Swiss-Prot record:
Keyword terms: Isomerase, Membrane, Rotamase, Signal, Transmembrane, Transmembrane helix
Purpose: PPIases accelerate the folding of proteins during protein synthesis.
Reaction(s) the record says it catalyses: [protein]-peptidylproline (omega=180) = [protein]-peptidylproline (omega=0)
GO BP: chaperone-mediated protein folding
Subunit structure: Interacts with IFITM5.
One cellular-component annotation, GO: endoplasmic reticulum
EC nos: 5.2.1.8
Major site of localization recorded for this protein: membrane
Name of the protein this chain belongs to: Peptidyl-prolyl cis-trans isomerase FKBP11
Family according to the record: Belongs to the FKBP-type PPIase family.
Gene, per the UniProt record: FKBP11
Compartment(s): Membrane
PPIase FKBP-type domain span: 57-144
Organism: Homo sapiens
Length: 201
């Protein structure tokens, strides 16, 4: 089989692209993460039946160990006090926060978190590379339930603060407008009024 000279560059380009794709696959440099969704596995069941699992607004005390898929540890709280977080306040990566929902005190879970729910394209240099899948082993040590009023205050207080700023600016503007449009009395009239008042006395 002979190739026409005009198709030779096209075949060479196709061969080059194919070999580059094979080399990249063999080197393990795939651009897409092998894990696309959050995977949560219970390692240790809670010691007693759990009446009230963790929910948004609750304060959790957790011990955790975070690692890459290859086993390299990126962070752990086992050598220090438990981490204290409030669910729903985005204090930890999204995948870890999602894995803590409905957890009970004494329960241990393993969460395998895809990069878009972890550190994303930037990573967390130097310990977490870009687009890395991470694994967290988490134990819930204590749970402080948020009461209804506390949730209400935390939900409404920022809105009230945001509404107060325009209201105060409006009041200040109104006061300045009234002050600027008040009829001005000349100094002569003020002196005359003062004299007239003193004469009447």
């Amino acid at each position: 089989m002979t190739l026409r000279p005009s198709l030779l560059p096209l075949h060479l380009l196709l061969l080059l692209l194919l070999s580059a794709a094979v080399c990249r696959a063999e080197a393990g440099l795939e651009t897409e993460s092998p894990v696309r969704t959050l995977q949560v596995e219970t390692l240790v069941e809670p010691p007693e039946p759990c009446a009230e699992p963790a929910a948004f607004g609750d304060t959790l005390h957790i011990h955790y160990t975070g690692s890459l898929v290859d086993g390299r540890i990126i962070d752990t709280s086992l050598t220090r006090d438990p981490l204290v977080i409030e669910l729903g306040q985005k204090q930890v990566i999204p995948g870890l926060e999602q894995s803590l929902l409905d957890m009970c005190v004494g329960e241990k879970r393993r969460a395998i978190i895809p990069s878009h729910l972890a550190y994303g394209k930037r990573g967390f240099p130097p310990s977490v590379p870009a687009d890395a899948v991470v694994q967290y082993d988490v134990e819930l040590i204590a749970l402080i339930r948020a009461n209804y009023w506390l949730k209400l205050v935390k939900g409404i207080l920022p809105l009230v603060g945001m509404a107060m700023v325009p209201a105060l600016l409006g009041l200040i503007g109104y006061h300045l407008y009234r002050k600027a449009n008040r009829p001005k009395v000349s100094k002569k009239k003020l002196k005359e009024e003062k004299r007239n008042k003193s004469k009447k006395k």
